[in-house]
Amino acid sequence: MAGSVADSDAVVKLDDGHLNNSLGSPVQADVYFPRLIVPFCGHIKGGMRPGKKVLVMGIVDLNPESFAISLTCGDSEDPPADVAIELKAVFTDRQLLRNSCISGERGEEQSAIPYFPFIPDQPFRVEILCEHPRFRVFVDGHQLFDFYHRIQTLSAIDTIKINGDLQITKLG
């Protein structure tokens, strides 16, 4: 992992057009970030809605085991926030697992993908597009899978969490 930081320092406000870096300084969404700190937790202003997209660009670590990108309903630890979608890249099995966790209960895990898109020590671009019935997930511009909503109040999905063996270079 690239490092860690206290929870209060790691919160970054995601806006439709503006971001704050991990030091709280405002920057434009199209500005290249010099490696944001992992684990990362950021607020998605206004939550998700059909047509809204979350972009994560980064570089996989040289010897990765796994990394995860989650969209959650807040950042509470106790009780844990509901997880609308968790994408977990597992390098030993070359799997991209998807699941949710609502009121402490994990849903049915999904794993079918046409190919494993992540390569150690290489950059990647993940786009999570919110549509009315589902999240549509693209990696490096290719649609990889759909994940149907298990949380129906999309605006409650207002937090992104990223952890594991990667470096974040840009969020939007």
Curated annotation (Swiss-Prot):
One annotated GO molecular function: carbohydrate binding
Lineage of the species this protein comes from: Eukaryota, Metazoa, Chordata, Craniata, Vertebrata
UniProt-listed InterPro entries: ConA-like_dom_sf (IPR013320), Galectin-like (IPR044156), Galectin_CRD (IPR001079)
Keywords: Acetylation, Lectin, Phosphoprotein
Protein name: Galectin-related protein
Cellular component per GO, a single term: collagen-containing extracellular matrix
PROSITE patterns linked: GALECTIN
Source taxon at top rank: Eukaryota
A Pfam family assignment: Gal-bind_lectin
Function summary: Does not bind lactose, and may not bind carbohydrates.
Modified residues (N-acetylalanine): A2
Ranges where the Galectin domain occurs: 39-168
Quaternary structure (record): Monomer.
Modified residues (Phosphoserine): S22, S25
